[in-house]
């Protein structure tokens, strides 16, 4: 059976990993060493934290990957290897517009702060952007929503999301590992984040070893 799967670029925030710790290079590295033990160096290589700014980005990436990115990646990889049917992978990257009064933990937040959050793609896929109160949508959001509705509808009907007028969505295959990036401009590109998922995968595999 064909598979269409993916996740969002900013699923969750750095605090999921660092809790109430200040997001610094030192706190991220200390947390990684505690969390991943003898696999910590490999994880830190995949999620670098040479500066505090880099540590903040890596903490958010690690939080998102351990929440949903790695497990979905693993599913896609196994389906590609054993499923015998086409696989299509996406990354929803659009930093979603927010209402003027949007907040995170009581602090005013912008679209850049919230990013491509968990479940943020749902209104795009179902063409229901206007059900979110207070948001002023850009023409590019409506275009992206229309294209996503068409991709998902095509896939539901035929097992292939591609169709007339849409940017080409290549199959996810071992030789290319193409990912469709859903943003103001849609484009396909090879997966560049694989080392992150492989680092987590190695840690998970070791936990299963007696």
Question: Which residues does each PLM region occupy?
Answer:
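A short, structured beta-strand-centered segment in the mid-to-C-terminal lobe
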Residues: 133-147, 192-195, 199
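Substrate-gating cap/lid region and adjacent catalytic-acid/histidine neighborhood
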Residues: 1-140, 151, 158
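Tryptophan-rich aromatic "cage" segments
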Residues: 185-210
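Mature extracytoplasmic/periplasmic domains
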Residues: 162-189
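K/E-rich alpha-helical interaction surfaces of small helical-bundle regulatory domains
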Residues: 146-162, 166-167
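A structural signal for short secondary-structure junctions
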Residues: 116-117, 146, 172-174
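A generic structural micro-environment signature
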Residues: 98, 128-132, 175, 186-188, ...
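Small/flexible residues
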Residues: 91, 173, 179-180, 196-198, ...
């Amino acid at each position: 059976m064909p598979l269409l799967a993916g996740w969002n670029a900013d699923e969750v925030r750095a605090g999921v990993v660092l809790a109430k710790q200040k997001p610094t290079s030192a706190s991220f590295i200390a947390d990684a060493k505690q969390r991943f033990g003898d696999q910590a160096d490999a994880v830190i290589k995949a999620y670098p934290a040479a500066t505090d700014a880099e540590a903040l980005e890596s903490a958010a990436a690690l939080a998102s990957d351990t929440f949903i990115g790695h497990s979905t990646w693993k599913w896609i990889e196994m389906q590609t290897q054993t499923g015998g049917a086409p696989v299509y992978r996406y990354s929803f990257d659009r930093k979603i517009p927010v209402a003027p009064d949007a907040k995170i933990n009581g602090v005013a937040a912008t679209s850049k702060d919230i990013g491509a959050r968990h479940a943020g793609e749902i209104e795009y896929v179902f063409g229901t952007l206007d059900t979110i109160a207070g948001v002023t949508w850009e023409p590019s959001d409506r275009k992206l929503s229309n294209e996503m509705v068409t991709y998902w509808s095509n896939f539901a009907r035929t097992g292939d999301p591609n169709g007339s007028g849409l940017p080409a969505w290549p199959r996810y295959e071992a030789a290319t590992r193409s990912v469709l990036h859903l943003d103001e401009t849609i484009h396909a590109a090879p997966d560049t984040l694989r080392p992150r998922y492989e680092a987590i995968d190695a840690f998970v595999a070791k936990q299963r070893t007696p």
